[in-house]
Swiss-Prot record:
Protein family: Belongs to the azoreductase type 1 family.
Pfam family name, one: Flavodoxin_2
Keyword annotations: Flavoprotein, FMN, NAD, Oxidoreductase
Taxonomic lineage of the native organism: Bacteria, Bacillati, Bacillota, Bacilli, Bacillales
EC number: 1.6.5.-, 1.7.1.17
Protein's name in the database: FMN-dependent NADH:quinone oxidoreductase 4
Annotated catalysed reactions: 2 a quinone + NADH + H(+) = 2 a 1,4-benzosemiquinone + NAD(+); N,N-dimethyl-1,4-phenylenediamine + anthranilate + 2 NAD(+) = 2-(4-dimethylaminophenyl)diazenylbenzoate + 2 NADH + 2 H(+)
Keyword Flavoprotein carried by entry: yes
Cofactor note: Binds 1 FMN per subunit.
GO molecular function, one term: oxidoreductase activity, acting on NAD(P)H, quinone or similar compound as acceptor
Described function: Quinone reductase that provides resistance to thiol-specific stress caused by electrophilic quinones.
Cofactor requirement: FMN
Length: 208
């Protein structure tokens, strides 16, 4: 049975957040089209994820080398392992997130930090790092009020670019990206822009 992990990185209500509307539209369409799949929803804001710090960094390094961990290190590594293993076990992963202050919410950055583990999501080789999750399907669902796909702000976009870069670093080769943008920049076209994006999400979810 196919396992699908939906990762939500916005705790604003749908009526206030287009990225949440996008996430919910994709989720509903996916469930309808794939009734036999196992769908797990991970709301990062409900998880209260601790930032990566000295215990997690030292603990993951020592664990990878087979060294003994302190009690604090073991606790920190157990937190990261919980989310890392869940990610690795999923056949498909869907990320729903906004662009905030040109980048992603801190909680999503922390989550991706947990996934960034040598020997698990990538490995070191003499030629450089090699990703290890190549057969995992990834979908990135993002909303941003301005236009960042082109024009003067394109170089400043660090949300989709960051998540896509990290998934690529982990070896993902099968990625879908859906972006709704410009609804705040062009308020007279907002309804049209959002509706078109939600329709695209439903179509992509059916085939994802």
């Amino acid at each position: 049975m196919t396992k699908v992990l939906f990762v939500k990185a916005n705790n604003r209500p749908a009526e206030q957040a287009v990225s949440v509307k996008l996430y919910e539209a994709f989720l509903a369409s996916y469930k309808e089209a794939h009734p036999n799949d196992t769908v797990v929803e991970l709301d990062l804001y409900k998880e209260e994820l601790p930032y990566v710090g000295v215990d997690m960094i030292n603990g993951t390094f020592k664990a990878g080398k087979g060294f003994d961990l302190t009690e604090e290190e073991a606790k920190a590594v157990a937190v990261a392992d919980k989310y890392l293993n869940q990610f690795l076990e999923a056949d498909k992963v869907v990320f729903g997130f906004p662009l905030w202050n040109l980048t992603i919410p801190a909680v999503l950055h922390t989550y991706i930090d947990y996934l960034n583990r040598a020997g698990k999501t990538f490995k070191y080789t003499p030629e450089g790092p090699v990703g290890l999750i190549g057969d995992k399907k990834i979908a990135l669902l993002n909303a941003r009020g301005g236009v960042y796909s082109e024009g003067p702000a394109a170089g400043a976009e660090m949300a989709v670019k960051y998540v896509a870069t990290m998934m690529g670093f982990f070896g993902a080769t099968n990625m879908e990206t859906i972006v709704i943008e410009g609804h705040n920049q062009f308020p007279d076209k907002a309804e049209e822009i959002i509706t078109a994006g939600l329709e695209e999400a439903a179509k992509v979810a059916n085939k994802f």
